[in-house]
Amino acid sequence: MSVINFYELPISALAIYLKSTTHLNQQDTLPLSISATTEPSYPIGTNIDIYHFKQQWQQLHKQSIKNEPLQYISSTESIEKQQVDWLINLFDTVFAAKNVVLVRGDNDPEYFPATATHPARIEFAHGFFQSALHEISHWSLAGAHRRTLPDFGYWYAADGRTEAQQKAFEQVEIKPQAIECLFSLMCGRSFRVSQDNLHADFDTSQSTFAIDVYHQAQLYINQPQNLPTDAKTLLTVFAFVCHDTIETGR
């Protein structure tokens, strides 16, 4: 099977669409409810200071590609950690009204529903930026009911699955990984699918998973109205905050 190049996806077309259907207010912020010109507005939770987050992202992006020192972070802290801190702050700000927080986990990812005293927690694995994007994609797809269930009520079998279990796993993962792909590309990060099957004892060479994820991502770009609302919200923020930096930095 040929290698799938996810960078070929026209992410700029999606960025242009999202920005063209969204208005900034005079303070260069995304307001409480993003105002769309061609479809109903969707809630964002609070005013988002685009300049603040964009300035930080520009510094982080510059450091990551040119290894230049940053003014506001210690040289002993990794860029990955700073990017994760930035993402947590952005996510928690954007979705403040959703009673959910993004949490750096020490172990495997897990979702904990909100309680009477604590917000829901999206815990991603080992502090990795990519894991955070993946778990956010699952959250964005989960409806109101599944967000009340531990791990969204998902069935999960660990690595070492049977061939039938692997096929079921891949079927469930197509849309989350397609959304993760769009998040990644909008942030200028690389993306590759995860089949999570390092210990498979069967032939995986005929799997169509990668191309299925590619086609689903392509479908979301061509029909952005089919994106989950919260995924669309975050992609819109990334389009304003991250994508211009990527385009001018290449």
Regions found by a protein language model. Give the residues of each.
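Short pre-active-site segment immediately N-terminal to the catalytic Zn-binding motif
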Residues: 115-131
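Auxiliary, metal-adjacent structural segments of Zn-dependent hydrolase domains
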Residues: 2-12, 16-116, 166-171
